[in-house]
Amino acid sequence: MRSNMLKIIVGLILIVCWMSTSRAQQVKHPSLLYTSERISQAKLRIQQDSVWARAWEEIKQTADEELGKKRLDKADYLSAVFLMTGDKRYFDKLREILLHIVHSKAWASSEMLARNPAWRADLNVAHKAYLSAIAFDAAYPELSAGERKQIAKGLYRLGVEPLLGDWLCEPTRIHSLNSMGHNWWTSCVCMGGILALSLQNELDEARKGAQTVYEYLPEWFSFAGDELQQKAKSFDEAGGMYESLNYANFGIQEALQFFVAWTNVYPGSTLPDIPQLKHLSSFFAHVCYPRTGILYNINFGDSHKNVAAESSLMLLYALGIRQPDMLWYIRQVEQGQHRDGYFRNRPMGFFYTPDLKGAPDVPALAHSQLFADFGWATMRNSWQKDASMLAVKSGHTWNHSHADANSFILYHKGVDIIKDAGNCWYPNPQYRNYFFQSQAHNVVLFNGEGQKREQQYHGSTLRGYLYNLLDGGNIKYVLANGTGPVSDHFSRNFRHFLWMDNVIYLIDDLKTHEYGEFEWLWHPGGEWKKRGADVTITNGEAAVVVRPLYPRLLALSDFVHDYPNDLYWEEISAPTEDLKGTETYYSLHLPGKFDRVKGVTAIILKDSVGQKELPVMEKREGKDWIGLRITFQGKVTDLYINQLADGRLMHSNSWIEADGWNTDAYLFAVTYDEGEDPAKPKEVFVAYGSALRRNSDSYFSSLSKLFYIQKGDAKKLDLWISGQPLVNAYFRTGKRPVFLNVNGEKATVNYKEGLVKVKYNH
């Protein structure tokens, strides 16, 4: 206790000493972002590399075009060129702009000022503060003392005081992290902080403001959300932010720019302890899709697939948080592929793009990742370009996070072959009437309805969740629970994503409070063509087959009246994301009214558009179970769905007998060679089971129900297990394995009478 108290006292003394030193320290301009070190590196680059020389010429051309104007918009270009060349023409223009803008009455918009209480600072004010800081920092050495003071006072009044006053500092603060703690908060606070850093030689209140930003910024990263207004935790434990890639990157970028400026102004200073920073790089990598051409990124929510996060990664790299996958990611981004990027021909990209020569060919990351805190998951078969990737979302709904619980996007051979409809400019009625709503996503509707429209503004009190991600190579699985957001209609809205070899099975477990009509929505990212009971979606070299299997097949022909019990389809016209036209999405309707449905749809990933041979899928049923037998290229998989394991039983366990297998598992699959004995499977998948038996033999036993994948050969047994922190389970193998891997880690082989015992506590 005494030791801890001593440490606290010493720490407080050091902080006081540092703050006293920083108050006395004069900032040597320019030192915010375009530092002398960055300038020297850039000059060397353009001498050695023609690509960088061309980028420099484009920056200079933009600055030259601004010499005949008097606007702040491109002050960063004027500043960069002045610092690179020393040409006083650019300084004169910066000086003219700065002396002009400080006479403005206010930077806030009339719409923001009309709010109650008035919002004196928004993103526009933040952007002007940033550009003003860059301009003042660059021009500072050439300005007279009187000009410095005049400009500093004006910029403090216009930028620092409203930004930090509204968003951070007492007694004028009107915002909290609970009400506006998303990307706006970091932009307003951190751009106000950067401007304050630039003004502190002239104004001690600016110095204090910058220190306040430095002190409170870690709280934004650590915000845990709340219950009363259903605000999401900002950052997932595995990295990343729930708002969508677009706004996650923007909010993070603004925070990191402040930290970079701070460490430049105060050399030798250290970053606060922010654990979330170390996971950002892997988050951005996991939600991207490398392809031939522009790098795609998951566009859940208010993002676009062209938007990338190279800016945040460059800033992390500049701060010394360096991981090889950062370089890999930055190298994938094409110049100019989105609006706000750090590209070579823009000042921040010009100064902060790291040397990419050491970038790996592929990142050293797992093929699958679950972001459980905000309900995203990605699964891919490779990190190579144009591979296959499935992205799943079931999490929060509010603001930039759409009404898309249990939705997904499928990327295959370079395209989003099953896509998200996207978004548009927010004031457009199509945004709130279509793009935000369930109808714009690949979900199940009941009586034509998905999530309530009010969730856009008020959020969903009950959110969606993702659980039990498993990746066993050719077998991958994740469970989505979207019941909460649609609980006005549904008591069960579960969607299982089971990816086995070249087929992804969507298994929907649906229960509603009353009888009604179910429909499945599909947003194709290519040409939709029905052939019999299958639908083929084709885009360039990519093709997938969508094959509904349960509760009914798709009606075989357009004469749907001849197939009164089968699924019929509806073509629905909707706006394209750019609002320049319309596109068609599809609804597959189940005739009749039901209150409980099991839906199974197979999505077959074709190796080529012309591939003729496809997996043969035989529908099979028994007492209390439904299933499939899938045969393809000498391999057979028997897939079983336990009808008793869907919550209909209270205290009785859900035991079934299926083809000689006895189990309480919700879902299980066994794979074996064609013509061989199913009792000797090469691969086993079990979802939510405590036992799998055949005859008198136990194949799997656990007191608690688990999810697992089992694969092995004569020497090795691989197990991937989820479902409980404490596992004490047995798995059957033919012989004692030499090696045992559990969840990718080596484990001790504990073998007896044909069973391997696995015990751990996580």
What spans do the regions from the language model cover?
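Bacterial Sec-dependent N-terminal signal peptides
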Residues: 1-26
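Active-site-proximal structural scaffolding
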Residues: 121, 125, 185, 248-251, ...
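Active-site rim elements
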Residues: 239-245, 266-270, 394-397, 428-432, ...
